[in-house]
Amino acid sequence: MSRYRGPRLKKIRRLGALPGLTRKTPKSGSNPKKKFHSGKKEQYRIRLQEKQKLRFHYGLTERQLLRYVYIAGKAKRSTGQVLLQLLEMRLDNILFRLGMASTIPGARQLVNHRHILVNGRIVNIPSFRCKPRDIITTKDNQRSKGLVQNSIASSDPGKLPKHLTIDTLEYKGLVNKILDRKWVGLKINELLVVEY
């Protein structure tokens, strides 16, 4: 299955808030299908919704998510927490969390178009796994800085997680350490994703 490029608000109405997918929010009471979904939710449906939340928030394909679950399963720690750490340490997600891009798809585009440097080298792979003490900057040209400047100006500095720091004047971000579970930007039960 390829990456989702369809209407984003439909997914948000179905799955709940996905800040990485879009900044838009649906109008209240605008879902006519909601009244028909009453009663008990099946366990399979709950697990599937949690998995879909993870996929759409981080912009993953089914195969990528399975690969991350496989890698997390080999770790000695909790599989769910390792899975979230792997996803949160992706370059596209770190750009989004730093405020250098308004959404994760926007961050993917910045990386694919070679506007981003990691430790002084151009990286054009959005799934690049960042490590502690990595320095993320933009290219020195005006166009790259302009793209990031608009996003930084509109982002909220209070939402910056503890494992990241940003210098807004130099358009530079720093990964301090590996993420703790409480700073994940998505409300999700990762154990249900692993069970699925």
Swiss-Prot record:
Pfam families: Ribosomal_S4, S4. Part of the 30S ribosomal subunit. Contacts protein S5. The interaction surface between S4 and S5 is involved in control of translational fidelity. Residues 1-43 are annotated as: Disordered. HAMAP family: Ribosomal_uS4_B. Keywords: Chloroplast, Plastid, Ribonucleoprotein, Ribosomal protein, RNA-binding, rRNA-binding. GO terms for cellular component: chloroplast; small ribosomal subunit. Belongs to the universal ribosomal protein uS4 family. It comes from the Eukaryota. GO terms for biological process: ribosomal small subunit biogenesis; translation. Its main location: plastid. PANTHER family: 30S 40S RIBOSOMAL PROTEIN, SMALL RIBOSOMAL SUBUNIT PROTEIN US4M. InterPro entries: Ribosomal_uS4, Ribosomal_uS4_bac-type, Ribosomal_uS4_CS, Ribosomal_uS4_N, S4_RNA-bd, S4_RNA-bd_sf. It comes from Melica uniflora. The keyword Plastid applies. The lineage of its organism: Eukaryota, Viridiplantae, Streptophyta, Embryophyta, Tracheophyta. It is found in: Plastid, Chloroplast. One of the primary rRNA binding proteins, it binds directly to 16S rRNA where it nucleates assembly of the body of the 30S subunit. With S5 and S12 plays an important role in translational accuracy. Residues 1-14 have a biased composition (Basic residues). GO terms for molecular function: rRNA binding; structural constituent of ribosome. This is Small ribosomal subunit protein uS4c. CDD domains: S4.
